[in-house]
Amino acid sequence: ITDTDGRKHKVRLAYIDAPEIGQAHSIESRDRLRRILSDETVDVQVTDTDRYGREVAYLFSDGLDINLSQIENGAAWHYTSIAKKQQPKADFAAYAAAEAYARAERTGLWARREPLAPWLFRKQQHTAQPQ
């Protein structure tokens, strides 16, 4: 994300986890986010910095919680292992409800019978790497 001063920031969307490149539905998820962010002014609410130096943030466009929208549209999972420790309760409830809705409607990545969560995909990739 580029700020109003022209500085670029690496941002990780707070409390969601999207499919990794090479994983089913990754391109659709990425492209959906790109469409939302292209030529849009977004409000960034930084909550933390992760171990990779990325700003962890909520993104908003015209009042729309983009992170929540990614979950609602089946483009990401609610990252509950982190969220249950850090996310405000009202946001946690909204994100959990959005994921339940997307699952029930078989929206986006939930159209697959048993989509593999990105954290499990990463673990598989790490385990498959020769030591």
What do the predicted segments below correspond to?
Residues 1-131:
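Small beta-barrel nucleic-acid-binding modules, primarily SNase/OB-fold domains
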